[in-house]
Amino acid sequence: MTLPVLIAGGGPAGMASALFLIAQGVPVVVFERSEQLHADPRAATYHPPTLEMLESSGVTAELHERGLIARRWQFRDRREGLIAEFDLQHLADDTRFPYRLQCEQHKLVAMMARRVIASPLATVHHGAEVVAVRQDDDRVRVTFQDPQGVQNELDGSWLIGADGGRSLVRKSQDIEFRGFTWPERFLVVTTTFDFEPLGFAFSAYTMDPEEWTATFKVPGEDGRGRWRCVFPTRPEEDEAMLLDRDRARERLAAFVPESRAGEVVHTNLYAVHQRVAQTYRRGRVLLAGDAAHVNNPLGGMGLNFGIHDAHHLAACLARIWLGESDACLDQYDRQRRAVAERYLQAQTIANKQTLEERDPRQRAARQAEMRATAADPARAREYLLRTAMIEGLRAAAMIP
């Protein structure tokens, strides 16, 4: 293997792939369609395994400098308040980072991109969209296009498709994206109001049969802190009305009346999917991140899962670079796809179902189970191993 690894997509999974590959001496070329980084509100939660994977590059230390540490997270009820609080210190024997770290996704991408661009092993093309893919036995060729429509071609040894849920790379290989789309869209309202004095942990999930809410704190651009609140919406609701900041402020006030004291600084609306690619490998074309799997954001798993894909994939490609066979790529497909189906999809779907449970008896039973789990250190650890994504990684490693 002498040609570079090509990477379509300069988001979290793509930049993480590049970062992990250059650390192992493998040259890369990254193609990112956007001419500059996206700064709109996206994911912001990093689980312990992700912090471990990013540690050797120095990114984890920088995340600690710029992010917020959430040592506990909560389940709440809109009427009753706190139901259960889970202390991540129960994972102290399982990880060096027994907490969640919260920092906006675009800041992470910038941290990784800065390190990748500084490497002589990397070339990063911004404003370059991959529009066609061809492959044969010993190489893969991509056609990429600049904003003016000018096209060029480049050969690589392998292509990582990390180009998002609508991945052209995935579509170019006729790989099915199996799953479904939720009927409701999710509204994200970012506010200056501080929920912490009201007893909210930096990450909290509030159950309600009519309108559940997820709240979490991020540093904000000025470091003073912002809170993001996620609400479900009805399919028939008008997009412009949902995004209107005055209406969003009223929605927040219906949830927490005191929030009128804060300012709504951003609103965002997006469709929510639960899908996994039919395969993560087709010859010399590989999938990672949202190109391989998408899920609802409850639990903060999607971004982390893409970085885990990148870490696994880079380790395999580095071995191939040194002359080993490509059998590990088939294992990558088996392991990462299986854990996406069994853990990522199952956990995020369960999270949503828990928050929106309409049956009063079922809701009461779930809340009683949460209280009992949080109060028992052994049960809490077992539950947190799953929600912190440690159990899934351990299970994947057992798949031959």
Regions found by a protein language model. Give the residues of each.
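Core beta-strand elements of the Rossmann-like FAD/NAD(P) dinucleotide-binding domain
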Residues: 3, 148-158
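C-terminal helical "tail/cap" subdomain of flavin- and related membrane-associated enzymes
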Residues: 316-400
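Active-site-adjacent segment of FAD-dependent monooxygenases/related oxidoreductases
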Residues: 42, 47-115, 344
